[in-house]
Amino acid sequence: MIKERTFLAIKPDGVQRGYVSDIIGRFEKKGFKLVGLKQLIPTKQLAQDHYGVHRERPFFKDLVEFISSGPVVAMIWEGEGVILSARKLIGATKPLEAEPGTIRGDLAIDIGRNIIHGSDGEETAKFEINLWFNQDEICDWETSDSEWRAEN
């Protein structure tokens, strides 16, 4: 069985405001498996590489400055449908458009401080996982309750 994985990053505002355990808990409760986790202050180069698709946009410089301004909690989550489910759990990019019950709908107000980043598709997830993690930082393990999470 191919395991779907996605990359998530709790941004400096989410770390500073103390939302790390709440956010991790939401994904654990949903039934996803955490296979990569680290906290770091991203270099400007890492931030530029991560947000390279926005390089020509007017907000690029501010985005790079913000993401490299403090600690980020980088994560790899695994599970069936994890990419789409994570996007739904995170909510709309603009927090004021995010539904209540989503991370951004519950915890964020401003688009420039929207708490969390999540991969938007399979190719992006692969790119971001490889950008932020070395292979030896990914822990491939089996949960003891996997038979209770989804039909095989």
From Swiss-Prot:
Transmembrane segments: none annotated. InterPro entries: NDK-like_dom (IPR034907), NDK-like_dom_sf (IPR036850), Nucleoside_diP_kinase (IPR001564), Nucleoside_diP_kinase_AS (IPR023005). GO terms for biological process: CTP biosynthetic process; GTP biosynthetic process; UTP biosynthetic process. The active site is at 117 (pros-phosphohistidine intermediate). Keywords: ATP-binding, Cytoplasm, Kinase, Magnesium, Metal-binding, Nucleotide metabolism, Nucleotide-binding, Phosphoprotein, Transferase. It comes from the Bacteria. It is an enzyme of class 2 (transferase). ATP binds at residues 11, 59, 87, 93, 104, 114. GO terms for molecular function: ATP binding; metal ion binding; nucleoside diphosphate kinase activity. It is found in: Cytoplasm. Its cofactor is Mg(2+). SMART domains: NDK. Its EC number is 2.7.4.6. Belongs to the NDK family. HAMAP family: NDP_kinase (MF_00451). This is Nucleoside diphosphate kinase. It comes from Prochlorococcus marinus subsp. pastoris (strain CCMP1986 / NIES-2087 / MED4).
